From Swiss-Prot:
SMART domains: ANK (SM00248)
One Pfam family per UniProt: Ank
PROSITE patterns assigned: ANK_REP_REGION, ANK_REPEAT
UniProt cross-references to SUPFAM superfamilies, sorted A to Z: Ankyrin repeat
Protein name: Putative ankyrin repeat protein RF_p42/RF_pd42
Alphabetized UniProt keyword annotations: ANK repeat, Plasmid, Repeat
GO biological process, one term: RNA processing
GO molecular function, one term: RNA nuclease activity
Sequence ranges of the ANK repeats: 73-102, 106-134, 140-175, 179-205
Length: 205
């Protein structure tokens, strides 16, 4: 390899660069396969999910494809479907047996990533056994409940509907993030009275 590069350098820089391109592409693919588990079938699956193409999602052959990260989005297929608010694909992946606790690119599992999205997806994930209190493995180390206090949706800071659901299924109201902030404290910091009242009525004084 080094001998070939030296020969190319000595002849012409343009030819040298052109000859290096395939080598660079090959190296990138090899690294991608090692780091992200890249394969063509996986990328077709990820593209199908991004395009909400349910028929193509159904064609995925190997279970392992569902538990790898997509190259372009750097997310798992399940979290990608959640981000697209595509409950049909989420249901399909869960029925197939995808790892519901697998973390995405920022350290959050499926439920954490769903908290500021479709309520029906949140309910579906809980129904399939998602860990209510699973924290981010990186950064703030916050729980889904803490995240629900700052979704900034529909003119409100907190997603009170999701707070209710999480509390109903046993979310730890006293859980703190890396800075020692609870869900109630976060709601108070943002002066979101609806979330404050809801959390206080659930037993936090």
């Amino acid at each position: 390899m080094h001998h070939l590069i030296d020969q190319l350098k000595s002849k012409n820089n343009i030819f040298y660069i052109r000859a290096l391109v395939p080598m660079i592409v090959l190296c990138v693919l090899l690294i991608s396969k090692t780091v992200y588990g890249y394969d063509t079938k996986l990328e077709h699956l990820c593209k199908a999910i991004s395009n909400n193409n349910i028929d193509l999602v159904k064609q995925a052959q190997q279970k392992s494809q569902y538990n790898q990260r997509c190259i372009q989005e750097r997310e798992t297929p399940l979290i990608l479907a959640i981000s697209n608010n595509n409950i049909k694909v989420v249901q399909m992946l869960l029925d197939f047996g995808v790892d519901i606790e697998q973390e995405g690119r920022y350290g959050g599992a499926a439920l954490y990533n769903a908290i500021c999205h479709d309520t029906n997806i949140v309910k579906l994930l809980i129904k399939h056994g998602a860990n209510i209190n699973k924290r981010l493995s990186e950064g703030s180390r916050e729980t889904p409940l803490i995240k629900a206090t700052k979704c900034f949706e529909n003119g409100s800071i907190a997603n009170t509907e999701h707070i209710k659901i999480l509390l109903k299924y046993g979310a730890d109201i006293n859980a703190k993030d890396v800075n020692g902030i609870t869900a109630l404290k976060m709601a108070e910091m943002q002066n979101d009275q609806s979330a404050i009242n809801l959390l206080r009525s659930s037993g936090k004084k």
